[in-house]
Every structure is written in C-alpha cells, then in structure tokens.
C-alpha cells in the first residue's frame, strides 16, 4: 500500500476521496490548505465574512478535521497565502488591467495545488502520491475526462505538468457525483449534505466586480452601441466587463438584451451590440500562448476543444507554432471566445493540455472592436 497525502478542503468530494483511499488500505494523510487572508490582503469591500465569528475558511477546516477524525486519519494545515498572492493573484489583477479575463482556478491549480502544495506533500510527508477530489482521471502522466461529464474538471487541470500527474490520484474520476453523495451518506460523513462550493471560495456571495474594486480602482466611462456608435449607458470600469457579458450592463429601455463585444481601456469605453447581432461576437480562429501539452500521441484529425468550462466540445484544427504558441481553427464559428481564458484540447477522452487565449479572429479580422 502507498502513503498518500490528500488535499482535504472540507467539502464532500475530498471527504469521500479520502474515505475511499483509507478503505483501500493506504496510509492516508489529510492536508488542509489556506490561500487567502482577508485582513492581510486588504479584502474589505463588501466582505461580509469579516463580521462573522468564524470565517468560511476556518469553518471548512473544522469540517475537514471532523471528517478526518471519522475516517481515522491525521490532518495538518498549511498556508500558501503569500505564494497565492505572488503567483496567482497578482497575475490575475495584471490580466484584468490589460483587458483580459483570466481563470483563477486554472492559475491556482498550476502554481499552488499542483506545485507548491504538491511539493510540500512529497517533501514534508514523504508521500508516494498526492490525491485530490477532482472529477478527472490521471494515468501514467496523462489526463483524461472524468466519467461524470456534468462534473468533469479536466478543463481546470490543463496547465498541470505531466511529471506531476504521474504522482497524482483522483479517486472520484470514475464516479458519478450522485454516487459520491451516496457513499458520503452511507458512511455518515460529516460533509455528506454540505453544499458544493462554486467560484472562488474567498469571494463568497459577493459580485466579482465588488471584490475586484479592492484592488483595481473604478474608472467610470461610457457604454457605446457598436452598431450605431451612440452612447447608451455608463460603466464603473471597462476592465470589469468580459466578452459576451449580458448581466450587469444596466441598460434600461432597450428593445432587446445587449452583450459586450469589446472595450478600449485607454478611452474608458465598453462596446456592446444587440443580442440579435451575433456576428459581433463570433470568431472562427484564435491565437493562444503558454501551451502546456502533456501528450504528443494524438490523432490530429480528431481534436476538439473547450473554450470555457461546461461548454460543448468544438471540432478544431490546431497549428503548433514555436515558443509554446498555437493557432486553433474552428470553421463553423463560435460565440464569445474570450481572450485570457483557457482553451483545453482533447482527443476523445484524453485531455492533451491547454493554452491561454490571446487573440480571436473572424477570417483575417481580429475581433477587437472600437469606434
């Protein structure tokens, strides 16, 4: 049997993953990770957790500790607050300030969970493997989709290196979410009925723009209808708006919904178009960088991609360039492919890796609208 350190988050998924590993006879060690401190990081605006006697992360640790005791495994905790700030959060803020929409979960997996946390588990505890409660499958350094397609998290793991995946176990990869809940309830685990977390845990129920205002000052400007060149509203900061966004525009009295098609940060303008004008949002190829390709054994005629989580697969052709850059073609077109987001590449069930979307195009024209 192996010595396995598992990331215990205080949620039902990692709880069941730890339980299953223990049932299999492994030596299991729970490790709780904290990446955020609201006071240290000046996270004040709209942060209701500051008024609570027990902050959400401490509640999660208590839940994880109760589960560890039930299962009969030790649990430890480790802080990566500075590392998260330096490697993930400053990157996140810089991307927003430059007009991109990054994915913090992918950055956290790349720099913290499967780097700092992974190395700590191996070096501190002498672990043979590191386990997580993700819905994905790692096998011989390769990454595959989780069996439960509605919960598959391979998209978020596209920047994890193959050398790391060789020592990673995802006990839930071959399971449906309903089965995970059933096991938790039958084992009477403390987290059996705990609600699934969504989004970035330390933001809580706040709007993401409210959270960002702690770190990126508001820069009010105008909202411009790209089809008429007329000002139709005002905004608090162009960098807060993402391609394809419909909610939060506060455009009253319009005949139909509008969506964001671009912005000009220098002129402090956000450009929108009516929902019926899909051409302003549709691209058919993209340029991406920072490619992490874990598997070179694939059928180039069978490639598909996801441009965001829980999106349907899109058939693509990929042109591999130098310096970890790629061009990806999808001739039928797709709406709201967003610069800054991750493109995940697949060959059937195998997730080959991913890259960060830099530019999007319709034929020869870059979709970067201005007036």
From Swiss-Prot:
Annotated Gene Ontology cellular component terms: cytoplasm
Site for Interaction with tRNA, residues: 134, 341
EC numbers for this chain: 2.8.1.13
Subcellular location: Cytoplasm
Main location: cytoplasm
Disulfide cross-links: 108-201
UniProt region (Interaction with tRNA), positions on chain: 151-153, 308-309
EC category name: transferase
Active-site annotation: 108 (nucleophile), 201 (cysteine persulfide intermediate)
Reaction(s) catalysed by this chain's protein: S-sulfanyl-L-cysteinyl-[protein] + uridine(34) in tRNA + AH2 + ATP = 2-thiouridine(34) in tRNA + L-cysteinyl-[protein] + A + AMP + diphosphate + H(+)
SUPFAM superfamilies: Adenine nucleotide alpha hydrolases-like
UniProtKB keywords: ATP-binding, Cytoplasm, Disulfide bond, Nucleotide-binding, RNA-binding, Transferase, tRNA processing, tRNA-binding
Interaction with target base in tRNA: region residues: 103-105
Matches recorded under Pfam families: tRNA_Me_trans (PF03054), tRNA_Me_trans_C (PF20258), tRNA_Me_trans_M (PF20259)
Top-level division of the source organism's lineage: Bacteria
GO-annotated molecular function: ATP binding; tRNA binding; tRNA-uridine 2-sulfurtransferase activity
Listed GO biological process terms: tRNA wobble position uridine thiolation
Binding site for ATP: 7-14, 33, 133
Protein role: Catalyzes the 2-thiolation of uridine at the wobble position (U34) of tRNA, leading to the formation of s(2)U34.
Family stated for the protein in its record: Belongs to the MnmA/TRMU family.
The protein's name: tRNA-specific 2-thiouridylase MnmA
Organism: Mycoplasmopsis pulmonis (strain UAB CTIP)
Organism lineage string: Bacteria, Bacillati, Mycoplasmatota, Mycoplasmoidales, Metamycoplasmataceae
